[in-house]
Amino acid sequence: MYKRILVAIENSAADQTILAHVTDLARLTGAELLLVHVADGFAARHFDDLKLRESEEMKADRAYLEGLKRNLVAQGLTVEYELAKGDPATELIRMVDARAVDLVAMSTHGHRFVSDVIRGTTADKVRHLVKVPVLLLRKQ
């Protein structure tokens, strides 16, 4: 059924909501989990152009991903992670093709009013532009 599930990680409490669902799904299908967090601060968005070093925030994001991976591997799951840089929707969409993902799992949030109306949400962009199923769970 599924071989590789991309799990969008926010470094927030919402991560536990989405992970609770996808870990069970991964066990049932034997799928690998690909944990992806997209750092989107100034340093991350201009990392390559300005030849910057990882910011403290990016280092903390990487440590968070490593901790999640360690915990999930201890539960018997196959897990990889990637800390991407830039626009979250663009990077998640790119990674679906680049990493042969066959399911995207991500949490959604309540509306941020003007920002969502003007730019749309990351979840909306991803679900409309990828060619694989997308599992959306509301943050609890």
Model-based region annotation:
Residues 3-49:
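Small/aliphatic-rich secondary-structure junction motif
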